[in-house]
Every structure is written in C-alpha cells, then in structure tokens.
Swiss-Prot record:
Residues 21-411 are extracellular. It is a single-pass type I membrane protein. It is found in: Membrane. One of its GO terms (cellular component) is membrane. This is V-set and immunoglobulin domain-containing protein 10. Disulfide bonds join 40-96, 150-199, 335-387. It holds the Pfam family I-set. Residues 1-18 form the signal peptide. PANTHER family: NEPHRIN, V-SET AND IMMUNOGLOBULIN DOMAIN-CONTAINING PROTEIN 10. It comes from Danio rerio. Glycans are attached at residues 34-35, 46, 135, 147, 159, 211, 269, 280, 284, 330, 357, 376. The chain crosses the membrane at residues 412-432.
Amino acid sequence: MMITSAVVLYLLLLSHQTVSEEQVQQFVIGEKGNNTTLHCLDHPVNASSVLYQWKKDGAVVATQNPPNPSVHLSISENGFLRISGLQLIDEGLYECESQAKGGRSWQTLSKIQLTIAAGPTGVSLDISPATFLNNGTLFVHKGSNVNFSCSSESNPSQNLTWTVDNLASDNPEREFGSKSPLAFSITNIQPLDQGTYTCTSQNTLSRRTANKTQELLVYYAPERHPECSWELGDKPSDVLFICSWFGGYPVPTLTWQEVEGAAEGPTINLTTSQQTEELNVSVNRSILHDGDKVKCTGHHVTGVEKSCSFTLKIPYPTGQPLATALEGTNITISCTETSSLPPAKTVWKKNDDLIENTSKYIVQENRPALTLTIVNVTKADEGVYYCYSENPLGARELEVYLNVKTSAGNGGAIVGIFVSVLVMMIGIVVGVTVYTKRDRICIGLRFSQLDDDRVDVLSLVDSDEEEIFHEAVPRLPPVTNGHATTLVEIHRIPSCDHEDIADSTEQSDQTRANLTEAGPQRAELQPAV
C-alpha cells in the first residue's frame, strides 16, 4: 500500500510540474472506456449569454452547436465537456474558454489535467510443470520443482501480488512486485504447498484491481506396496480377500484378479476394480482350489503401479506320528502348520471330539506350533490323537499315536541296566589285574618262546681251581630249608646244530648225577661242539 501511494503521489507531482506554468486548477482521473465530464469552473451566472469551446493541449477539440456533432466529445448548455468512451489519447490538459455572444475574444475560464487509467487487464498466470484435470484443476507431483508466473496490462503502472490460500500458511502473500511478469518458484514441492493460488494486479492510479486464481494439488502415490490379506466372511462358506494401499493422494484404483487358476475345476472369475484405499471381495470357498493365484494391483494417477499376490494352499500339518509316555507322568505332543493360505485353524481332536483346556488337557498355541499336554497319563489315554487343520480350501489332519507304558513293564529294562553295569565292572577288574601282573605274564611268554626256538644244555662242572673267580660272586639268598644254593651258568646251543646231540645227552646224565651231591658246586651250560 505504501508503494502504491508513493507512485500515485509521484505521478501527481510530475503532472503538477508539467503544467504548473499553466496554473492547472483541477486534476481528473478517468478510466479507459468510461465516460467523464469536465466542468468549466468560472463560467458566468447567465450561461446562455456566452459561447463555450474546449481546447486540449492548445487545440480546439469541441465547440457548441458544431455543424457535425461528435458522439465522443460534446459541450452542454452550461459549458461542461462530456467525453464518452475514454481512450488513452484523451489524456491531456483541457482548457474551458468562453466568449460573449457577438464578441470576438475568448476568455480562459479553467484548466483541467485529465489522466486516463487503463487496466489492469489481461491478467494471466502460469504454473509449470503441471497437468490439467477435467475440472480445470492443476496437479503436480510431490518433490518436483514448480515455477509460478503472473502478468497483466495496466496504465500507467501496476502492482502484482501472488497469494496462496491453504491451511498450512499463516501468511498468504508469497510474492510482490511492480514488474510484469512476476515470477517465483517452489523447490521440492510438498503436500503442504497445495492450495488456491491467486495473482492480483492493481492499477496504481485508479486503484482498480483484477485477479486470477488457480487451484493447485500435489499428488503422490503410496510409498509402500499394497497389502493382500484374507479372513473368513460373514457366511461360513465365504472367504474375504482384502487389498489395502494407504498413504497416497488422491486415493488409488485397486483391482483384484485371478492370475493363475487350478488345472481342474471352475475358475474364481475374480475381476473387481474400484477407486478406494481398501478393496474387499467375498468369494465362495466352493470355487477355491489349491494352487490358485490371485493378485491385487494398485494404479495411481501419478503413473505409479504396484501389486501384491498370494497362492492359495491347503493345510498340511506336520509332526511326530508316535509318542511314548510312562503311566503317571505328563507328556506333550505337538504339530506345526505353516503352508496354508489363507492360514488354517488348527485344533486337537480325539475320537472326533474337540479337545479343550481342562485339568486333564492343556492346549497351547504358539504359532506356528500347537501343543497338547496330557496331565497324569493313564492307560486310558493311549490311542490316536488328531491334529486337525482347516482353511477355506479344505482340511487335513495329522495322526499321533500315544503309547502308554506301565511301571511293571520297566523290570526288564532295570535288569538289563544292572547286567550292563556288572559286565562293565568285571571288565574293569580284569583289566586292572592284567595291568598289575603284566611283568610276570610277559616273562612267562618270553621263556615259552625260548623253549620253542633253541635247546639249552645244563652242565654242572666241579672245579678245584679257585683262581678262576677273581671277583666276589654274588650269592642268592638262602632258602628256608637251609640247603646251599647252586650257581648255574647257561650256555646257549643253537637249535640247528644236531651233530653232537649224543655227547650232550651223556653230559646231561653226568650233570644230573652231580646235582645230587651236597655242598658248593658250579654248574656250567656249555654249547655242544
């Protein structure tokens, strides 16, 4: 506002300086295309006694009672100048002159400065890059760089202002200036920047304004993929397929369709499309088959397309088919089901009766496992238990046979354990005994080998030559019966020498004879030669 006032004041001063010498008495502002009337200020009281004419910039432009009246310029009876349909060329200094009837001179009565204000017209704005919708609204993609430009025509000058009307901005003014076009830009535009953008142009002289508005939307697709899920329908025979894709603007278009059907049986014939963030489709379970593949595709106006899918699978519970328990104890059996789509409901049964939590049975679900604990097992608990899994495609079960053993049946096991321990202890004793007697056992084996490999001859020889014993001969300790110990020398004879066996035999006889004698003797085992 301050800038506008300053411009108007400047123009007025400029006009005043231009015609100051002419003593301008009035300044009039007219708008292009409108009508205006210039008053002759000092006209006589009896206007009918005088004639009037008007000059513009020193040239006569209008007289009373002209031979060819002008629609654009005309003079009233009281001397007022009426200008119809103001044009820019009408701008200038106007002088009102009067002359008495029959007189010959004209007298200037007033001088008026007429200024023509035009516009603003032709206000236009441009927002790019942007796309028009059918209703004329523009949209841009989130994260893009957007340029804004506004222009208009105005005389003598104008002020341009960009404003935005949205909930996120406290200050609606975005840009201001007097030069046309007026431009600014937004880098990495976000959803908070969407709103109604207005370009306003104001004539600095006439204060007339003109504007143009444009609604701008910021579109963006969801960042994540669609999510496919399922649940049982309102009817036991129905299953509900759920596709959701949240987080985009505007809402996407979701489509359910069958991608791959089963080899046999009727197809799902699932093709449903809707502009929404969540699309639910109810399908009768009778047309669902193991191996059917369904897909949900999300289309967004920004051009983004994403999808999710799943393949239908019948349940297949797994686990150990045999369990053994001791009577009077607790036992836990379990089964696991992970392959079914939609997820199956799994329960434990016995004899087609559903097993629920009681003081006897404890059922616990810890997905994907389902456990059954039988408390204080008895012989009556023996039998087949069923892990039953069912989903909309069908049902399957796992048979688990429970074998219950009584305490009397453990006697054989106890005896077996006792015998095993006894055999182990005997083995340990034998091993320790052999280890402690290893020297005797080894020596006995050694002598038995010597008897097999060679023939030894024992010879006892009496000797009177005491000098052959130069060193003290060690004595063996005396035996308890008091007899003297005989010293024996053993000389080995290889078993392969058999020539003098007869002589050796004679010596052996002699040796046996000598051993019968009492007293210290010397035995010598000499090899036969």
